[in-house]
Every structure is written in C-alpha cells, then in structure tokens.
Amino acid sequence: MRRVMVLFGVVIAGVKGFMLTLVSMFRPKVTLRYPSEKGPLSTRFRGEHALRRYDDGEERCIACKLCEAICPAQAITIEAAERGDGSRRTVRYDIDMTKCIYCGFCQEACPVDAIVEGPNFEYATETREELMYNKEKLLCNGDVWEEALDFRIRKNRPYY
C-alpha cells in the first residue's frame, strides 16, 4: 500500500510539472536577445560621459571646476585658461573612466549642463588607456548623443 501511495505522489508531481510547463509555453516571452534587442532605459540612466555644446557649436563648459571638486572618486581633471574676452574655457578635461563610480554628482553640480552621463552603456575596450577620456572624446560623445541628452534633460526637469 505504501508503494502505491509513493507511486501516486510521483505521478501527481510529474503531472503538476507538465502543467506548469504547458502553461508557461503560452505566456509572452520575457527574454531579450541582447545584441539585437535592447530593453528600455530609464531617463535617469547614467552611462557614458559626454560634454555638450551650445547650438552655435561653442562648448558649454565654463571651467568652474565644480565637477572636479565634487567627484568622490577624483576621476575628473580640468585645466582652464582665460580667453581674450575675460571668460574661461577648458584647455584640458579628462575623465578616468576606470575610477568613475557613475554617481552623477558631476552632472548635478554643473551649472550649465555641460557634463552629462548619456544613454550609452556599450563602451567596452581592449586596453585600459582607451578608458581615459579626453576633451575631444567627450565632445564627440556629446555630438553623437545630443538629441537623446537634450530629451533626457528636459524630461527630468519639468519645472524649469
């Protein structure tokens, strides 16, 4: 009698397993085929850094060095020079992406929205030196992602 009960329990467990599989076969898929399919990103996602420009092509950074001062990882290095009209601009703007912790403090501290963390999360490299971003690389990122960056900034600041 005991063997019959054990056998009955095994059969019931098997039927339950098959039912679970059968039900899940007709549910919508939740798996993304990553390289070809990408999931949605939050407008507040913090990815690869970029320096933005004004509409006339001039860089936004005014060399106030607030981002350098607030960076907890000390990943940002800025050198500034004064221009003929009395304003300052950056001569050197470097970010060591191997040190960066993607906290977003630099973006929050910037009074002119010059430094932002963009939507790009695919920036793997083969060497460590490629993760040392200079001003030209950051401006290039800003030019490539400007439309998405502008949308994200407007979306996160509804009261301005």
Swiss-Prot record:
Record text on cofactor binding: Binds 2 [4Fe-4S] clusters per subunit.
Coarse class of the protein's main subcellular location: membrane
tRNA processing among keywords: no
Membrane topology: Peripheral membrane protein
Keywords: 4Fe-4S, Cell inner membrane, Cell membrane, Iron, Iron-sulfur, Membrane, Metal-binding, NAD, Quinone, Repeat, Translocase, Ubiquinone
One Pfam family from the record: Fer4_7
Main enzyme class: translocase
Family note: Belongs to the complex I 23 kDa subunit family.
Task of the protein: NDH-1 shuttles electrons from NADH, via FMN and iron-sulfur (Fe-S) centers, to quinones in the respiratory chain. The immediate electron acceptor for the enzyme in this species is believed to be ubiquinone. Couples the redox reaction to proton translocation (for every two electrons transferred, four hydrogen ions are translocated across the cytoplasmic membrane), and thus conserves the redox energy in a proton gradient.
UniProt-recorded name of the protein: NADH-quinone oxidoreductase subunit I
Species name: Anaplasma marginale (strain St. Maries)
